[in-house]
Amino acid sequence: MTSGDKETPKREDFASALRFLMGGCAREPEMTAMAPLNLPKKWARILRMSSTPKIPIVDYLEAAESGNLDDFKRLFMADNSRIALKDAKGRTAAHQAAARNRVNILRYIRDQNGDFNAKDNAGNTPLHIAVESDAYDALDYLLSIPVDTGVLNEKKQAPVHLATELNKVKSLRVMGQYRNVIDIQQGGEHGRTALHLAAIYDHEECARILITEFDACPRKPCNNGYYPIHEAAKNASSKTMEVFFQWGEQRGCTREEMISFYDSEGNVPLHSAVHGGDIKAVELCLKSGAKISTQQHDLSTPVHLACAQGAIDIVKLMFEMQPMEKRLCLSCTDVQKMTPLHCASMFDHPDIVSYLVAEGADINALDKEHRSPLLLAASRSGWKTVHLLIRLGACISVKDAAARNVLHFVIMNGGRLTDFAEQVANCQTQAQLKLLLNEKDSMGCSPLHYASRDGHIRSLENLIRLGACINLKNNNNESPLHFAARYGRYNTVRQLLDSEKGSFIINESDGAGMTPLHISSQQGHTRVVQLLLNRGALLHRDHTGRNPLQLAAMSGYTETIELLHSVHSHLLDQVDKDGNTALHLATMENKPHAISVLMSMGCKLVYNVLDMSAIDYAIYYKYPEAALAMVTHEERANEVMALRSDKHPCVTLALIASMPKVFEAVQDKCITKANCKKDSKSFYIKYSFAFLQCPFMFAKIDEKTGESITTASPIPLPALNTMVTHGRVELLAHPLSQKYLQMKWNSYGKYFHLANLLIYSIFLVFVTIYSSLMMNNIELKAGDNKTMSQYCNMGWEQLTMNLSQNPSVASQIRLDSCEERINRTTAILFCAVVIVVYILLNSMRELIQIYQQKLHYILETVNLISWVLYISALVMVTPAFQPDGGINTIHYSAASIAVFLSWFRLLLFLQRFDQVGIYVVMFLEILQTLIKVLMVFSILIIAFGLAFYILLSKIIDPQPNHLSFSNIPMSLLRTFSMMLGELDFVGTYVNTYYRDQLKVPMTSFLILSVFMILMPILLMNLLIGLAVGDIESVRRNAQLKRLAMQVVLHTELERKLPHVWLQRVDKMELIEYPNETKCKLGFCDFILRKWFSNPFTEDSSMDVISFDNNDDYINAELERQRRKLRDISRMLEQQHHLVRLIVQKMEIKTEADDVDEGISPNELRSVVGLRSAGGNRWNSPRVRNKLRAALSFNKSM
């Protein structure tokens, strides 16, 4: 058999199965021969597993496109999922059938539940494709199903939009038969309906079909507010407009009414046509009855719009077609009271201006701001229009609402005064021009003021030549020279000074008493200042008593300060009416560079009338930049730090309290290194402690009497104590502070501390020895019962052995209670005397501290521990001084407390040592947390203790474990011990349960289970978590705590030590040579370093060797870059000067030659705004208000 013969039975089986299925499906009464085949899964699997070869997708889609239904069916039944297959364009079989008008394929796809709303890559459905391909039968079939007619493609077009845009008239007619399934008012892109598209593309037939067959309404606007008739007018769609007119006439609406429809902005179609700039559309609107005098919402007519656009052809057309409306339009004004002539003048359209004036427009009409077309053209730099209007006889004396004439606007906008003057002289009179020269506006400024302000050199020169007065003052009493000085117009100033009256105006003052020299100095225009000084400007003061150098210092212009000082050095220390020097004013304005320059010049550090220095203002307003410039000055820093402060005894304490970062810079400056290699033996590090010592301490002065309120006695370690008070960890951890404490420690601290520790250790030893001897030298004395004397006379060991053998005798002894007494040996008496002497001496010291510290002493827990220790120790040693040596339970309790607290206080002593002290600090911090937590959760201990007392106190045959629940106090203690894990579950609960002695076993076990969950598990883990968290916080604050303890230690010592002796051991500076071989350590230092680790290890303190290596490198690199920038700037200035000389030599005229150097008014306003708003992060509005108030301080404050 051949391979074909082998496959024959398989094909027959497949064919018979298929015939059976087809027959069964056809026999169903509700299904036809074309009904979809709902094949069972096993038959579908048989079909897929048959040897039928796989057919490409292209063949399947080509079958749909060709309309061959048999092939399409065969391919579909081979794989039902092929109905959703798409080609490269995203088109399905339904798209292909619709494109080729294959209704049979579409009908079969519908029978197979195909998707007719599927989109291709362009977003088109089969309905879009049918419209685009003129497949009318397919279109009719799809609409009859019906399919979704509102699907939008990528261009936001529904099928009806697409048919209208492509002018598919026949397709629209087919769609009109199914208008009930089509939303004709559906919006596409920008909300445009199909009627909008017909108007835009002028498809009149489409528009007619949409109106007649679809009942489309032309009164439906798009999202932009335009009606279809506006779109037709804008796009000159005359045929479509005619359709709209006919529709309106059929409904009783005239053409004039149709052409007068307003859009959202109040535009009629004629406005839209003018906006579009198409003269045909305008002509169409005019022929349709549109009025050129129709106003939109802003009251502008189409003539206004055409004049603003410069469309003279449209203007002429409108006037020619509607001559009766011309006069009305020429005088019609918009919301700004502007006529069409204003619009044409504003946008510099001289041809339209000439035409409008020829047609009778009012050449001197005024708008809302009283501007004529001439003023409006001049304000918008329309110089062609300006000259034309002058030639046409426009009035040049008209002023606007701000009283500015045309000459003001010519100067302000950079017009050529020579051309303007020539036009006025030729067309009008020279006298009229003379009147304009010195006229003032509402601010009192003449054209010469504006020429000086804006730096128009040529205009200024022409104004002076024409006879303008150079000493006119505005409302602020400012002359043109003041304006030129304020804006840095060097050449303008020179021209004004070279004029006839130049020598008379150089020293004139404005309303604030400021001369041009004051103003130029305040604005930092160094060249202008130099020019004024060379021309003989006098050094007057303004109304606040300030000289030019003070104003330059306030603004921070260092070059101006140096120039003024080089000419008039006596200005440096002059004061204003409030007693402020230039340094005060520069500090108030936070100008660090000016402060550095002034201090380098040698300015005096004086106080103003409020008795405040410059550093006081920097501290008061919290200006770190200003303070840093003063306290880190190379030469004058010591003088600044020596000044007294208004609120603090000295500047150092004020900086620590208010500006720690600034004082950190002071500390950095106090550490200097030798100028040699760091590995050299001669390399040293010098620490200066002058600012930490605070040698300049001043008393507070009573303002009324002038006497000292407090004595100016030296305060121990004032700087370090202030750091501790304000929590300045970074300052305490600074190498200078640590080295300062190390100097104190090495000078006297370690000796006194070790001596104190040694004395306390002796007391501790005697307390321990006494307690041991007391317990070993107790004797028993019989009471009144003489029968028990034989037992009482025995020693403790013999008595214990006898009592263990005779329990009845032991109970009798307990009942009769023998008296106990101590054997007063010499050792016990000696120890008791030493203890008493120590306690008496320390009690006197504690009483002195109570007198000094008062309430603060009581709040210290350590002091309470000390008093309890002293009292318990005295009670403990009392039997040693009694004749009979009697001892009772009180003495036992006192002895136990004294021994415990004495050793506990030794632990507190160790917290001042660095290596072990940190652990003591952590222990105490966690102890505080534990006490707080236990105070809160003691509620649970009481709750469970009472519950266990009720459940376990009444056991019939109690075991020893149940005795702990016999009363409430014992039950609470037992509950607390159970919290630590001592449950004894078997003995307390299990044995009792199996002996049936638990009264309520279920309740007992329930409460026990709750207890085990809440107390040993939950509460103990909570305590551990809190402890870990507190350890982290303690580790973060350990540095401050350790250093604070050292500060407190040295402060207490210095309060008690003689001042003369302290002056002898203190050092103002310390020099270390880190590379030299260290000498042999002393015994004390060796012990401390070995066991306690000296609080100031050499390794940590030596880190300062390289603490500013990077800073030095960065500073050097920055200085090098600054020098390069200065050189580049200098070279650019030289090249700019040479280029100007070349241009002048070659007589090249440019617009730049007409503008003087300096800054523009807008730039000056922005700079002033930044200064007023705070140019840096330290100038908040609140601080700026305070600063302004400070400038006018008086003594009454």
Curated annotation (Swiss-Prot):
BP GO terms, sorted:
calcium ion transport; cellular response to heat; cellular response to pulsatile fluid shear stress; detection of chemical stimulus involved in sensory perception of bitter taste; detection of chemical stimulus involved in sensory perception of pain; detection of hot stimulus involved in thermoception; detection of temperature stimulus involved in sensory perception of pain; detection of temperature stimulus involved in thermoception
Query: Topology versus the membrane, per the UniProt entry?
Result: Multi-pass membrane protein
Q: List residues in topological domain: Extracellular.
A: 775-827, 878-889, 954-968, 990-1004
Which residues are glycosylated according to the annotation? N785, N802, N823
Where, subcellularly, is it found?
Answer: Cell membrane
Describe what happens without this gene: Eliminates avoidance of elevated temperatures along a thermal gradient.
> Which top-level group of life is the source organism from?
Eukaryota
Q: Which Pfam families match?
A: Ank_2 (PF12796), Ank_4 (PF13637), Ion_trans (PF00520)
Describe the intramembrane regions by residue range.
969-989
PANTHER family registered for this protein in UniProt: ION_TRANS DOMAIN-CONTAINING PROTEIN, TRANSIENT RECEPTOR POTENTIAL CATION CHANNEL PROTEIN PAINLESS
Complex formation = Homotetramer.
The Swiss-Prot or TrEMBL record describes its family as follows: Belongs to the transient receptor (TC 1.A.4) family.
Q: What is this protein called?
A: Transient receptor potential cation channel subfamily A member 1
Q: Which organism is it from?
A: Drosophila melanogaster
Recorded name of the encoding gene:
TrpA1
